[in-house]
From Swiss-Prot:
PROSITE patterns: AA_TRNA_LIGASE_II_ALA
Pfam families on file: DHHA1, tRNA-synt_2c, tRNA_SAD
Protein name, per record: Alanine--tRNA ligase
Gene Ontology MF terms: alanine-tRNA ligase activity; aminoacyl-tRNA deacylase activity; ATP binding; catalytic activity, acting on a protein; transferase activity; tRNA binding; zinc ion binding
SUPFAM superfamilies the record matches: Class II aaRS and biotin synthetases, Putative anticodon-binding domain of alanyl-tRNA synthetase (AlaRS), ThrRS/AlaRS common domain, Translation proteins
Cofactor binding description: Binds 1 zinc ion per subunit.
Length: 874
């Protein structure tokens, strides 16, 4: 059975059981900074399990794209390890529970996948008698085929929050796959028993003290790895031998000029290339971009590891983008976003390949220098910390370092390397642990929301509202009141204040009541329909139950709205000028300015920036009507409305439509028509990472003031010339030409003076052991000046050894020269290195000429004295 059939059968089966089929969420988790990647099918539904959001439907089924990288070094070397994989799952949010989950799983596996009941084994949590009863008495699984396992394997929990026992379905692959032990069973890791489906029964809430409380609304979270079950149904020894991978691996083999199945080294390389290319293709499509931190570092590491395996098969030219094109061709029907973003994805991969080729060459050069130095020191082992530096700084895999080292007769301190790697992983683990799955504050606010109910936002319609203060928080705890000058968080039944979100900053304003005045410093929405106002008491004191009038500052709200609508115009203009591959990668909308990050492969030319700016201003001049509509997510997508990959939307979405010019899903505040924006001015465009550009801009009076400041600067620039703005470029050009001519005249005079000075130095030449020796300081000379001085000396002397020094702008330079007739005895590189060392520097070079730098100008005279001893010693 092909993977496509398995995927379709699974989704259709659960649809027949009343589940809604949802498309896979992005690999980049929506609104969850604690997670780098969507690593499990339940991740998109975490808010429903934690109670942070209310689901539109209670039964859902998905085939979720997942990415995990903890065991990256195992990929390609084992039958089951992957970075990217697809997870089939069915979920219940307070609807059905164990009986349905278990019986449906058994029905699907045995009747729809056709796996023999005799090959199936079950695990349950140690004391989950309810699950045992269902498996044994309802489904009919013999008791000897049901194994009870402990908390480590069969209980799901991640810190504070919902949790529960697990039950797993295993397939017996046959005794020939086992260890031969009479005790071999599902708990054995020999590989005979393969887990294909994990059923998680979410029935408890774990608090900070480790106590477990039964949940009123229980949940189901199941996961079946598509690649694993495909390997079982297709009767192949590993996931890599399924139709999911073979087409990609065969194509990669064709590009690389090798064959799969004949050589273990080749097979491992092809598996790594296929797996990693799938991962980077899907991740980049979903908005991740190669960089040196976070998700970007993972992408870069995977790409470089795949390239390294290609290099081991003698491929130095970029090729992963070709393999990625095959991934898109194979998976594009199931995941249409792959085809929609294909041009962008493939270009990013190719650019990164070319970039790494340069980095790889730098690493090779560093490794060669390192081995040469170690040889001079009589050592034949590359220290672990230096091997790690090659890996960490240059992306140089340890396997490649070992391979090159062995060719040159070196070994690598692998233990030292592993220690450095483990230290890095330890730091990463600690960093991850600092961000809890569900923090104490999250749990506190969730409980508070359950007590208080939802907060209604009315800020789209009005800027002020009278309501009641229903809670006050200070230092993470509920309090009854706040006194003058105190800060805290206020919760009201209704609010017109827009909370920070979607790149837009929060509203500012005041909360007024009988005997008190609060300044609103910030507004946030930590949970769905739950808004907090961070305030400072300016006058009086405030307590829970007080009546209050919430007043949004209209000026800052309108300025923010102008900038937010302008970002929508800018987004559309970018697509029109640069191409449809452009997508929003981030934004910041404040009352003062806007910042828009977008995906693009290269810098935007001045000409294109002008076009983009013109398109936005033309849309402003047309005074297009800004309309707000509500529709379903499916209808919005069908209508071509722009949606962001890393945002999570409910079934009902808010569409901001600007005439016929633009339509985007957005929850922010906007102007009523584009004419209100007034004027749009781009401040600049820059790179913020591989494949991501940033534009900063101003609107309205801010843009006008900026243009006026430019006019003021131009006016000051014209004053010395007494000319118009139009005449200024020519005047400046003429001035620069005159200055260049004067510079040439000055340079010529300086060379004449230097020549005279250098010739005068020849009077200080002394003779040691028949060699003419000269050491001197050339005042104000940089390295170029020292080279010119040396040319004069060289033309005037024979049988010489020379050491010159210069200090310019606090920087020390040395140059040593040896007559070529004497290079068998004296070495300029040795001499200059010895001198530079005294001045706190270093350098070297050829036997006849070498140069170096120093850090301490006060040591220059002392450094020059080494020449006499050097010549005398030879």
């Amino acid at each position: 059975m092909l993977a496509r059939e398995i995927r379709e059968k699974f989704l259709k089966f659960f649809e027949s059981k009343g589940h809604k089929i949802l498309p896979s969420a992005s690999l980049i988790p929506a609104n969850d900074p604690s997670l780098l990647w969507t690593a499990a099918g339940m991740v998109p539904f975490k808010p429903y399990f934690t109670g942070a959001a209310v689901p539109e439907v209670r039964r859902v089924t998905t085939c979720q794209k997942c990415l995990r990288t903890p065991d990256i070094e195992s990929v390609g070397r084992t039958a089951r390890h992957h970075t990217f994989f697809e997870m089939l799952g069915n979920f219940s949010f307070g609807d059905y529970f164990k009986k349905e989950a278990i019986t449906w799983a058994w029905e699907f596996v045995t009747e729809h996948l056709g796996i023999s009941k005799d090959k199936l084994y079950i695990t349950i949590y140690l004391d989950d008698d309810e699950a045992f009863d269902i498996w044994h008495n309802v489904v009919g699984v013999p008791a000897e085929r049901i194994t009870r396992l402990g908390k480590d394997t069969n209980f799901w929990e991640i810190g504070v929050g919902p949790c529960g026992p697990c039950s797993e379905i295993y397939v017996d692959l046959g005794p020939e796959k086992g260890c031969g032990s009479p005790d071999c069973g599902v708990a054995c890791d020999c590989g005979r028993f393969l887990e294909i489906w994990n059923l998680v029964f979410i029935q408890f809430f774990r608090d900070e003290q480790g106590n477990y409380t039964p949940l009123e609304q229980k949940g189901i979270d199941t996961g079946m790895g598509l690649e694993r079950v495909a390997s079982v149904l297709q009767g192949v020894p590993s996931n890599f031998d399924t139709d999911i991978f073979r087409e990609i691996m065969d194509y990669a083999a064709q590009i690389l000029g090798v064959k799969y199945g004949y050589d273990e080294k080749v097979d491992v390389a092809l598996k790594v290339i296929a797996d990693h290319t799938r991962a980077i293709t899907f991740a980049i499509t979903d908005g991740a971009l190669p960089s040196n931190e976070g998700r970007g570092y993972v992408i870069r590491r995977l790409l470089r590891r795949a390239l390294r395996f290609g290099r081991l098969l003698d491929r130095e030219e970029p090729f992963l983008h070709l393999v990625a094109a095959k991934v898109i061709e194979q998976m594009g029907d199931v995941y249409p976003e792959l085809r929609e973003k294909a041009e962008h994805t493939l270009k990013i991969i190719k650019l990164e390949e070319e970039k790494f080729r340069e980095t790889l060459n730098q690493g090779l050069s560093m490794l060669a220098e390192l081995m040469e130095r170690l040889t001079q020191e009589g050592k034949k082992e590359i220290p672990g910390h230096l091997a790690f530096k090659l890996y960490d700084t240059y992306g140089f895999p340890i396997e490649l370092t070992k391979e090159i080292a062995e060719e040159k007769g070196f070994t690598v301190d692998e233990e030292g390397f592993k220690q450095q790697m483990e230290e890095q992983r330890r730091r990463a683990r600690e960093a991850r642990e600092d961000v809890d799955y569900l923090s104490t504050r999250d749990a506190f606010l969730k409980q508070l929301k359950e007590e208080l109910g939802e907060v209604t936002f009315v800020g789209y319609e009005k800027l002020s509202e009278s309501t009641e203060i229903i809670a006050i928080i200070k230092n993470g705890q509920k309090v009854e009141s706040l006194a003058a000058e105190e800060e805290g968080e206020i919760i009201t039944r209704v609010t017109p204040f827009y909370p920070e979100g979607g790149g837009q900053v929060a509203d500012k304003g005041e909360i007024l009541g009988d005997g008190f005045k609060l300044s609103v410093l910030d507004v946030e929405k930590p949970l769905s329909d739950f808004i907090l106002h961070k305030v400072k008491v300016v006058e009086g004191s405030v307590k829970v139950g007080d009546k209050a009038t919430l007043m949004v500052d209209e000026t800052t709200r309108m300025s923010t709205a102008r900038n937010h609508t302008a970002t929508h115009l800018l987004h559309k203009a970018l697509k029109m000028v640069l191409g449809e591959h452009v997508n929003q990668a981030g934004s910041l909308v404040t009352p003062e300015r806007l910042r828009f990050d977008f995906t693009h492969f290269e810098g935007v030319s001045d000409e294109d920036l002008r076009k983009i700016e013109n398109i936005v201003n033309e849309a402003i001049l047309r005074n297009l009507l800004v309309q707000i509509d509500y529709t379903t997510l499916d209808e919005a997508r069908k209508a071509g409305v722009i949606a962001l990959f890393d945002e999570k939307y409910g079934d009902l979405v808010r569409v901001v439509k600007i005439g016929e010019f633009s339509a985007e899903l957005c929850g922010g505040t906007h102007v009523s028509s584009t004419g209100v924006i007034g004027f749009f001015k781009i401040l600049g465009e820059s790179s913020i990472g591989a494949g991501v550009r940033r534009i900063e801009a101003l609107t309205g009076l801010g843009a006008l003031e900026y243009v006026r400041s430019l006019e003021d600067t131009l006016q000051k620039a014209t004053e010395p010339y007494k000319c118009t703005f139009a005449e200024l470029p020519e005047k400046i050009s003429n001035t620069l030409k005159t200055l260049k001519e004067k510079d040439r005249e000055i340079e010529a005079l300086m060379q004449k003076i230097a020549s005279i000075e250098v010739k005068s130095l020849l009077n200080s030449v002394r003779e040691i052991k028949g060699v003419k020796v000269l050491s001197a300081i050339i005042d104000g000379a940089d390295m170029e000046g020292l080279r010119k001085a040396y040319d004069v000396v060289k033309a005037s002397l024979a049988n010489y050894v020379v050491l010159l020094a210069g200090v310019k702008d606090g920087k020390v330079n040395f140059l040593a020269g040896v007559d070529k007739n004497l290079t068998d005895k004296y070495h300029a590189g040795e001499l200059v290195k010895e001198a530079a060392k005294i001045a706190g520097g270093g350098g070297g070079g050829r036997p006849d000429m070498a140069q170096a730098g120093g850090k301490n100008p006060e040591k220059v005279k002392e450094a020059l004295q080494v020449i006499d001893a050097y010549v005398q010693s030879k």
